[in-house]
């Protein structure tokens, strides 16, 4: 799936998880529509962080579905993600949604792909969106070769992604657990 207009990054280090997202919304390939969109939010009484990349309406549909699954499984993020992706794969309308979610709680970081996969990274760093590869590379390097904390790694990695990706800006929303 091709995603534009965003970078979402999660970093866990020393027991802290940070989830960051830029604020740019791009219409097509030629126009920036918004600079300060909120693509990162807290779910389940603030215990889970979530960010999205892709079509906004589709992402909100996925947020709603995920939140309903969270309630069903009493806040267990991994189980809710797996249950949601089962529905995602089975439902012919959900399969057409063009969005991805990046989820984090104190123990796990998960990517829910546009094809209904649940992926947990090996190295406590994950990113989605058009600037995701740049933010991911920066975050991995900073995690491995610096004494920076999760929040600083996330902010600096997002700054680097914004310098490279034309669909990402430096208006960053960052949440931590």
Curated annotation (Swiss-Prot):
Annotated signal peptide: none
Catalytic activities: ATP-dependent cleavage of peptide bonds with broad specificity
GO molecular function list: metal ion binding; threonine-type endopeptidase activity
EC number(s) on file: 3.4.25.2
Activity regulation behaviour: Allosterically activated by HslU binding.
UniProt xrefs under CDD domains: protease_HslV
Protein known as: ATP-dependent protease subunit HslV
Enzyme class: hydrolase
Keywords linked to the UniProt accession: Allosteric enzyme, Cytoplasm, Hydrolase, Metal-binding, Protease, Sodium, Threonine protease
Function text: Protease subunit of a proteasome-like degradation complex believed to be a general protein degrading machinery.
GO biological process, alphabetically ordered: proteolysis involved in protein catabolic process
Main location: cytoplasm
Subunit structure, interactors included: A double ring-shaped homohexamer of HslV is capped on each side by a ring-shaped HslU homohexamer. The assembly of the HslU/HslV complex is dependent on binding of ATP.
Protease as UniProt keyword: yes
Active site: 6
Gene from which this protein is expressed: hslV
Family that this chain belongs to: Belongs to the peptidase T1B family. HslV subfamily.
GO cellular component: HslUV protease complex; proteasome core complex
Record's subcellular location: Cytoplasm
Binding of Na(+), residues: 162, 165, 168
Domain of life: Bacteria
Record PROSITE patterns: PROTEASOME_BETA_2
